[in-house]
C-alpha cells in the first residue's frame, strides 16, 4: 500500500514518507518496552516529557517516545491500537501539514498523537470539529486517553457560560467547533474588563475536515451584530417594484459572480416610480441601498437552495452542506430584503459590531494542521494561503470501490429518469443507495421522480436536519434508499448492514457535478470505506447549474454536434472533456474570488489588529491613561489643522473662525491665541503659534496623573469611544467593499483602490476617536468662559 501511494507523490513528499516510515519503526521498537510499564509508570511519562521540554528539549526530541506512549495508553483505555499509517498521519499533523485520509481511516484516533505532544508545552491545543456532536464525541473518546496520561481536556461549545468557557480554555486540550473559537475571540475583544476574557494566546490547532472549514467557509465572516431599525414599508415597496423589473432591460445579473446591477432603463424606472430626479444623489442613498438589496434578494437568492422559509422566518442554508445555519442572518439589510420578497414580517436590521473571516482567524495560530479525506485538489491554495502541504496517507486496507464513468444527458428530465432506473436496478439487488444532491430543491425533485415509481426512500435535507444522525446511520442497511444533500452527515460513518457486503456494498449516485472536484470525491467516499465494497455513478445533464453558469455559450455550440440515443443519453465522448474543463474553470473562478476577498480582508485585518491591540492595552489596569492621552492632543491638533488649512487655498480663504472653535473643543485653555491670515500662513505656523499654549495645556493634563478615579473613568470612556468608532468603521468598510468592484476607473486595480480608500476611512475613524477623547478631557478640565 505504501508503494502505491508513493507513486502518486512528488519527490519531496516521497522523501517525507520515507522519513515517516523510519520514525514509525522507531515508535514500534518502543512498544514492547512500554507495554511492561504499570499504569502509573506510563502516566509519569507526561511529567518526564514536560521536564525535558522545560530543560531545553524540543517537541522533535520527544515525539517518537511520546507517540509510543499515546499508542500504549489508547490500547489500555480504549482497546484501540494505532496502525502504522495512523502514526504517519500523526507525524504529518505534528509538522503543521494536512493529512489526507479517506473517511473511515480513524482520523479521530490519529489526532490523539500530535495533540498530546503539543499539549505538553503547556500553552493549549485546540481541536476543531465541524459540529457540536463531533466535538462532544471526540472529547469523550480521545479525552479518556489524554486524561489517563494526566492532561486536562475541555469542551468549548455555544451552550456553555463564560465561566465554563474559561475553564475549557485553561485545559491542555480543548475540543470545539471553529466558529465558536472565532466568536470567543471577537467577544474577548469587546469585553469591558480582562476578567471577562476567556481565551489565552493561540498555540496549536488541528482542524478536522479542514477543507470544509478553510475552503468552503473561507469567505464566511463571523459577525457579532447589534440591532438597528429599518423601514419595513420601504422594504416591501422595493420588493414590489423589483417584481416588475425585466432581466437585461432593467437589470443585469452575472450568475458566475452572483452580482446584480441596474441598467440605465432600470435607474430611470426607479426615478419615475419614486418621482425623483437623480437616484445617485446623496439624499436618495437609502432608497438606492434598499433597491439594490431587493434586486439581490430576487435574483441571487433562490428559495429552497440558498434559504428556506420555516415558521414564518428566513433560515439560511449552507450551500456546501445543505444544513440550516442556525442563528445566522444576512447583514446590511439583505436579510430584510429576503423577508420582504417572501412577504414575511420584517425583523430588525443587523449592525456589525465585530467581525473576522474564518481564514484570518485561523491564520492567527502560530501552528496549524488538519485532516480530511479530500484536500489534494486544493493543495495550491492551502500552500499559498496557509503554508501547508497536503500529504496523502496510505489506507490501512486497499480501496476497492468501483467509480463508474459519468453519464451525461441532454435534459434534466432525462437525467432524473435515468437516476430512477439506476435506483430500481440496484434496489432490486438489495443494495443500499445514497443519492447525493446539490440543494434542498434538487433533493425534492429527485424525490418526486421516485414517487412516480412508488419507490420508498428517506429524505435528508435542511428541512429534516433533526433526524440527520439517525437517517445516515441506517443508510447502509439492506434495501435502504436515502436522498441527501451532498455533505449531509459528514463525520458520521455509513455502516453496512448485515448481508450488504456480499451484495456489493453501498451504491452512491451523484445527480450533478459540484463546483469542486473535492466535494464530488467526498460523495464518492461515502461508499467503500475501510476496504468495503461499493460503487459510485454520476448522472449529469447539459441543464445542470454549474454548466449553465460557467459554459452557457459553449453548451449552445456543443449541442449542434452531439449524438444521443433514444433516452437522451449523450454518446459523443467529448462531452466528458467539456464537463471536466468546465469544472476546472469553476474551481479556478472560486479560487480567484477567495484570493481577491482575502486581499481585501487582509486590509481590515491589519486595521482590526491595531484597534484590538490598543483595546487590550486599555484593559490593562496598569496602563497610564494620561500617557495615552498626551500624544492624542498633538494628533488632534494636526488633524484639525489639515481640515481647515486647506492646501491649495490662500490663507485669506481659510476658515479661521471654525478652526478656533474646533481647537477650543479639544483644548481647555484660558487664552487661546488669535488665529488669522496675519500670523498663520501654513500648518507649521499654527504649530509655532500654539507651541506655548499646547505646552501649558499638557502640563495641566499631566497633573491629572495621580487621580486614580479619573484614570478609571478615562479607561471606560476610551473603550466606549473606541468601540463606537469601530462599529461605524465596519459599516463604512462594508459599503466600500460592496461598491469597489464597480469603480475600476481606466486601468486602476480595484484592490489598490480599496486599500487606499480603506486607509483614508481608518485614519478618519482613529482621528475621530482621538478627538472625542481630547474633548472629554477638555470638558473634565473645564473650558474657561473667555474661550467659549
Curated annotation (Swiss-Prot):
Topology of the protein relative to the lipid bilayer: Peripheral membrane protein
Any GO BP annotation: protein import
Subunit structure of this chain's protein: Monomer and homodimer. Part of the essential Sec protein translocation apparatus which comprises SecA, SecYEG and auxiliary proteins SecDF. Other proteins may also be involved.
Protein name: Protein translocase subunit SecA 2
SUPFAM superfamilies associated with the record: Helical scaffold and wing domains of SecA, P-loop containing nucleoside triphosphate hydrolases, Pre-protein crosslinking domain of SecA
Enzyme Commission code(s) on record: 7.4.2.8
MF (Gene Ontology): ATP binding; protein-exporting ATPase activity
Functional description taken from the UniProt entry: Part of the Sec protein translocase complex. Interacts with the SecYEG preprotein conducting channel. Has a central role in coupling the hydrolysis of ATP to the transfer of proteins into and across the cell membrane, serving as an ATP-driven molecular motor driving the stepwise translocation of polypeptide chains across the membrane.
Residues the entry annotates as binding ATP: 86, 104-108, 493
Gene3D superfamilies given in the database record: Helical scaffold and wing domains of SecA, P-loop containing nucleotide triphosphate hydrolases, SecA, preprotein cross-linking domain
Catalytic activity: ATP + H2O + cellular proteinSide 1 = ADP + phosphate + cellular proteinSide 2
Pfam families attached to this UniProt entry: P-loop_SecA, SecA_DEAD, SecA_PP_bind, SecA_SW
Keywords: ATP-binding, Cell membrane, Cytoplasm, Membrane, Nucleotide-binding, Protein transport, Translocase, Translocation, Transport
Record keyword Translocase present: yes
UniProt record similarity statement: Belongs to the SecA family.
Cellular localization per UniProt: Cell membrane; Cytoplasm
Organism of provenance: Bacillus cereus (strain ZK / E33L)
GO cellular component: cell envelope Sec protein transport complex; cytosol; plasma membrane
